[in-house]
Each structure stands twice: as structure tokens, then as C-alpha cells.
Amino acid sequence: GPFSPERTGGLPCGDLVKLCFSGKYTLAEMKKKISGKGGLVAYLGTNDAREVQKLIDAGDEKAKLIFSAMAYQIAKEIGQMATVLKGEVDAIVMTGGVSYSENLTNQVKEMVSFIAPYMVIPGEDEMLALAEGTVRVLNGEEKAKIYENEVKL
């Protein structure tokens, strides 16, 4: 998938394997490089889209390129999903903290709005989603999912 403020997104597997076995990094360091120190953090030293926009506004061409690459990857992922949905897409909804960036959301909109209606709902609602899921389990509407055999690195 696309890179995000702190996650790398898709990577070339061969290069990743070489890096893992280079002896330069511990397992914990590699995990942090992929999630936490990847994405915008790896490229620009920040996970804050507002800071990236300030860099762009100040004429930083690298920041502009990285932000455009992020928009491109997001749009590409949306296009891939539209394909497997056989074009039956009701709407495209941009969410999360980066959705506060009009620059980013407008770039994505330009590339994908032909697929379906496009809307932006900025912010993160992970805690609300967890709470609502818990209520559904407590009300007997869903069964709790137990992840006993998840992969541990």
C-alpha cells in the first residue's frame, strides 16, 4: 500500500531482505524503520502533514515531491481497489490526520474523482471504532475475535 506519515508502505522485497540481514540493524530497529520511522518521517523527519506543507510553502522541492508521491501512492491504491470492485464503488472517503491537508487531498481527488464521489472526513476515529466494536460484542451482535495464532516477529 501507500506510505503514510510513519509507515513505509510497499517496499522492494529483495532490498528489504538484504537490509534485514546486513547486520546493521536489530529486529526492533527494522520493525521501527517500517512502522514508526518510515514514510514521511524517513523522508522528511516529520510525521506532521502541516510541517510538510510549511516546507512546501517555503519552496522545499523535496517536500513537494515527497507529498506528491504520497498522493500518487494513495490514488494508485484507490484505483487498485476500484478494479477489484469491478468499478462498483459507492464513494471514496479520505480520512485520518493527513486528510486535514488540502494539498494532499486535492491531489488525490484530481486522480480518483472520476471513479466515484470523493469526500474528505479529516481525523482519526480508531478509539470510537474500538468502543463501538466492544459494544457490539457486549450486546451479542458480534463474537469477540481471539488472535491466538497471530504472527510474532
Residue ranges and their predicted role:
Residues 32-86:
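Adenine-nucleotide phosphate-binding core of ATP-dependent small-molecule kinases
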Residues 99-100, 119-153:
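Glycine-rich phosphate-binding/hydrolytic loop that grips phosphoryl groups
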Residues 1-46, 54:
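Glycine-rich phosphate-binding loop plus the immediately following alpha-helix
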